[in-house]
């Protein structure tokens, strides 16, 4: 689950590009819902919004690493 302590950059680097895109889509939907809850005063845990935004940044970072060739899926699997 996004925003949890179990989602680390290492875990993200082990995912395929397709799975990263799915996780990114889910995280963006969650941010939308959390922002709506925050605006209406229903958000109980403000830290959750911050955690999900950071997860989105982590996903974008891993995707960018692959785009510019810093890391690839094969490198992470072999290590």
Swiss-Prot record:
Signal peptide: none annotated. One of its GO terms (molecular function) is structural constituent of ribosome. GO terms for biological process: translation. InterPro entries: Ribosomal_protein_uL29, Ribosomal_uL29, Ribosomal_uL29_sf. SUPFAM superfamilies: Ribosomal protein L29 (L29p). Transmembrane segments: none annotated. Pfam families: Ribosomal_L29 (PF00831). One of its GO terms (cellular component) is cytosolic large ribosomal subunit. The keyword Nucleotide-binding does not apply. Keywords: Ribonucleoprotein, Ribosomal protein. Belongs to the universal ribosomal protein uL29 family. This is Large ribosomal subunit protein uL29. It comes from Tropheryma whipplei (strain TW08/27).
